[in-house]
Amino acid sequence: MIYIGLPQWSHPKWVRLGITSLEEYARHFNCVEGNTTLYALPKPEVVLRWREQTTDDFRFCFKFPATISHQAALRHCDDLVTEFLTRMSPLAPRIGQYWLQLPATFGPRELPALWHFLDSLPGEFNYGVEVRHPQFFAKGEEEQTLNRGLHQRGVNQVILDSRPVHAARPHSEAIRDAQRKKPKVPVHAVLTATNPLIRFIGSDDMTQNRELFQVWLQKLAQWHQTTTPYLFLHTPDIAQAPELVHTLWEDLRKTLPEIGAVPAIPQQSSLF
């Protein structure tokens, strides 16, 4: 099994694809990257509506709120964690994983706080961690310590692949904005648990995206044997994200013919 989705479930330009709600999005994709929870908790009635609009086969991968990962830096935040998990509890059977997106200021010295935080989390969920500090990508003791600690706890490494967007010509504001905001970190495809999460940050050049994605075809074919990967596809202008899925899917299908149920992705070429 492999889960493939986008960073969000609606966009004005997706109306032409028949995607205007979470319910309609879930007819095409089997998971979504939950970016909204980084910035604010949804209201209880909104969480219930999300449950009503999906089935038990769908998976949410929500980010921990920034109040936990950034402001508190994982310290003295038990009440915030409880509030977050309680708020999202109606969706508990559909949680693919909760994951931390740590800022670049969170370095090796902060690892004890990360271990304490992860060790205090409830055991019924899968978890992931995305790091951005340069030392965690230097192939030294700091990176080894991080990977070893995640592996020991069964926590997934969230892998950011921003090569496409940083290789793109900065010919649009969307590209320039993404190049400013998306970290430019090395891609180390390290497996630390059973649900590796890949965030592929494409550009608006679909030919280039396809070329740079080739490395993931081999890796996903390998990981798919023993794990359940999550693949989230981004574009600088998120309106083009379904087109990126369509661009890459043929190669995915050739590489992983046995992956089972796949998103019923509409044809994009005439729409963008």
Curated annotation (Swiss-Prot):
Belongs to the UPF0759 family. PANTHER family: UNCHARACTERIZED PROTEIN YECE, UPF0759 PROTEIN YECE. It comes from Escherichia coli O157:H7. The gene is yecE. This is UPF0759 protein YecE. Pfam families: DUF72.
